[in-house]
Amino acid sequence: MITLFRKPFVAGLAISLLVGGGIGNVAAAQGGPPKSGVFGENEKRNDQPFAWQVASLSERYQEQFDIGAAVEPYQLEGRQAQILKHHYNSLVAENAMKPESLQPREGEWNWEGADKIVEFARKHNMELRFHTLVWHSQVPEWFFIDEDGNRMVDETDPDKREANKQLLLERMENHIKTVVERYKDDVTSWDVVNEVIDDGGGLRESEWYQITGTDYIKVAFETARKYGGEEAKLYINDYNTEVPSKRDDLYNLVKDLLEQGVPIDGVGHQSHIQIGWPSIEDTRASFEKFTSLGLDNQVTELDMSLYGWPPTGAYTSYDDIPAELLQAQADRYDQLFELYEELAADISSVTFWGIADNHTWLDGRAREYNNGVGIDAPFVFDHNYRVKPAYWRIID
């Protein structure tokens, strides 16, 4: 551990004992990590304090960057709400603000889930990230249907293709305008476009791209700036930004857009990672590359799978996960947050893609590759909201 970038958490622990449940929680909260540095089975499962009994993550990093969590509206009550208020000072909607959630049919808006998240963030003085205005997935098909009811991508007539392009851009602009005007006083950073780079190189051949070329990216940012104002912070968000080839493709795109005057404020690094991948060196290189363009960096969807890719051989229950594997995860979280602190001047936010291990999209991936049975455990709080070894490593 490099102590230069770490600070004691005694003060935060004292506060947590006062607000986290009273005298009855003192013994649990003072338990801390085992002196050996490795959790035994019973110690791992039952002897660690609950998330609401320990020092706050957001207070620990308040001088460096925001600590956020992705949420669904139903998680804003009970224990999960208690954990959110204690550990996080930033929120993002996991699904409730995606295009298919907000405008499933043209002109028909569904604000209920998104509004609930906005109101929770406002009530508890939290920062709010918006995810996402434009994406190739979870976008309703009506965006890409022409006025005759045909798929725009199938059109071959040049004049009709141009008309379809303008219609799609108009629909996108209207969607962005409506959303940004509604939430601009609450949202502090916007994922304007998401996952536009293809893993195989170049731009993703989405319907957006096939119909408009790169114009949809440019117009999306310009529209968000127009209706959000200069104070709106606008991000281009993607996964695997640590992969050199994909990083370079994203860098070249962003550099070109900036040279055209497109208002981009930063890059969102999703950071869906694994214990053994990517390297800290590649992670550092990605942040530094976009910092060189004068851009902010945000870690937007952090989770750390126990497995490689694909996640074959997944454990079938939480109790089957070896203590040594959770310790390896803790070591990697430690290295990662050490890097984040070192580069804190260039990283404004670190958001986990969930609250605790009992709700993660990675469980679906584990089941997909293991005959319908499998779980993952990517966060610093376990499936019962107890702290994991990773928590103790990043709170010190």
Curated annotation (Swiss-Prot):
Position of the signal peptide: 1-28
UniProt xrefs under Gene3D superfamilies: Glycosidases (3.20.20.80)
Family: Belongs to the glycosyl hydrolase 10 (cellulase F) family.
Gene Ontology molecular-function annotations: endo-1,4-beta-xylanase activity
Organism ancestry: Bacteria, Bacillati, Bacillota, Bacilli, Bacillales
EC numbers for this chain: 3.2.1.8
Active site (record annotation): 195, 301
pH note: Active over a very broad pH range.
Compartment(s) of residence: Secreted
Record flagged with keyword Secreted: yes
GO CC, alphabetical: extracellular region
Span of domain GH10: 51-396
Gene: xynA
Protein's name according to its UniProt entry: Endo-1,4-beta-xylanase A
The organism of origin for this protein: Halalkalibacterium halodurans (strain ATCC BAA-125 / DSM 18197 / FERM 7344 / JCM 9153 / C-125)
Any Gene Ontology biological process: xylan catabolic process
PROSITE patterns noted in UniProt: GH10_1, GH10_2
UniProt pathway annotation: Glycan degradation; xylan degradation
Record keywords, A-Z: Carbohydrate metabolism, Glycosidase, Hydrolase, Polysaccharide degradation, Secreted, Signal, Xylan degradation
SUPFAM superfamilies assigned: (Trans)glycosidases
Reaction(s) catalysed (UniProt annotation): Endohydrolysis of (1->4)-beta-D-xylosidic linkages in xylans
Primary location group: secreted
